[in-house]
Design a protein with these regions (language model features):
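N-terminal leader/linker segments that initiate helical-solenoid repeat arrays
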Residues: 23-89, 276
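Flexible helix-coil transition and linker loops at the boundaries of alpha-helical arrays
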Residues: 43-46, 78-88, 116-123, 139, ...
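Start-of-helix signal in alpha-solenoid helical-repeat scaffolds, especially tetratricopeptide repeats
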Residues: 51-54, 88, 122, 129, ...
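"A position-specific structural signal for the A-helix of alpha-solenoid helical repeats
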Residues: 59, 93, 127, 183-186, ...
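Single-residue signature of alpha-solenoid repeat helices
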Residues: 70-73, 107, 150, 204, ...
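Alpha-helical linker/edge segments of TPR/alpha-solenoid repeat scaffolds
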Residues: 101-106, 132-145, 181-197, 232-243, ...
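TPR/TPR-like (Sel1-like) alpha-helical repeat modules
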Residues: 145-162, 232-256, 262, 266
Length: 279
């Protein structure tokens, strides 16, 4: 599903923009269906280009592909038109381009730029929370600060997704519902991974279970693996083993998840064998 760019207005006259430059992270569940979603600000009214030159420069910038090229174009556009209402769309596209390239650091940087322009952008909220949760480690000195940022962003995204997500005009009701469901799944996944890393295993199990249910039609190995870890810490070994097996099946060609899930499965199987010997 390819998303069209928003309808723009030049000097207050709406101008339809072709979908040729629209973006889609094809094949990537954790952002595949969303593409470059419109910001909440654009949902409220048609964004305006103040001149024909601005409108044409925006079109040229949006037609580029690749995270690096799109980011450079967005920076140049922002410098040339510091008050433009269109800049957020270029940074949003750069964010999704970097996501397609698995460049989480630059995707996060672009998400932060989007949020500075539109604090109610659900996709930027959940993508940034996802990257922040993935980055957390036990040695972080600012773990509590990072955890609170993730909580705030996920909570806000979940609060506004029904009203702030604006799909393209040709999106079907089913596509819009699927996009919103993906955002919710991402938010609960980020919350659960963060909670797992700070030792809130019950909270992690709760939120990762919601995320797993949200991705049931297309099981996500990463979510299932972290859910199994939370259940392991809660000594729910039967559930943990079932979910790590599901993670193995869903991992496909993702070698990192397969390796981690295989190690967790061996640990759980060893525990099960030890328990049977004791009995």
């Amino acid at each position: 599903m390819t998303r069209a760019r928003p309808m723009l207005a030049l000097f207050g006259i709406p101008l339809a923009v072709a979908a040729a430059g629209s973006v889609q992270a094809a094949g990537d569940f954790m952002f595949g269906a969303l593409g470059a979603a419109q910001s909440a600000a654009a949902r409220k009214r048609v964004p305006l280009a103040s001149s024909l030159e601005e409108f044409q420069d925006y079109n040229r910038a949006y037609a580029l592909t690749g995270g690096g090229e799109t980011e450079i174009a967005a920076d140049r556009f922002a410098a040339a038109y510091p008050h433009s209402e269109l800049t957020v769309y270029l940074y949003s596209k750069a964010m999704h381009e970097y996501r397609k390239e698995n460049n989480s650091a630059r995707a996060l940087a672009m998400a932060e730029k989007v949020l500075r322009l539109d604090a109610d952008d659900p996709a930027a909220l959940v993508l940034s929370a996802t990257v922040l949760a993935d980055r957390m480690s036990e040695s972080d000195l600012d773990r509590e600060y990072a955890a609170e940022r993730i909580r705030r962003r996920c909570k806000h995204a979940l609060e506004i997704v029904d009203t702030a997500f604006a799909a393209s005009a040709n999106a079907t009701a089913e596509e819009i519902a699927a996009d919103k469901a993906t955002l919710r799944t991402m938010a609960y996944s980020a919350l659960g991974i963060m909670e797992l890393k700070i030792g809130d295993f019950a909270g992690a199990e709760r939120d990762l279970h919601v995320a797993a249910e949200g991705s049931r039609t297309r099981p996500d190995a990463r979510i299932l693996y972290h859910l199994s870890l939370a259940e392991d810490r809660l000594q729910k070994y039967t559930d943990a083993l079932a979910n790590v097996n599901r993670a193995m099946l869903a991992a496909g060609n993702d070698g990192n998840v397969r390796k981690a899930a295989a190690e967790e499965r061996r640990r759980l199987e060893d525990l099960a064998r030890g328990a049977s010997v004791q009995h």
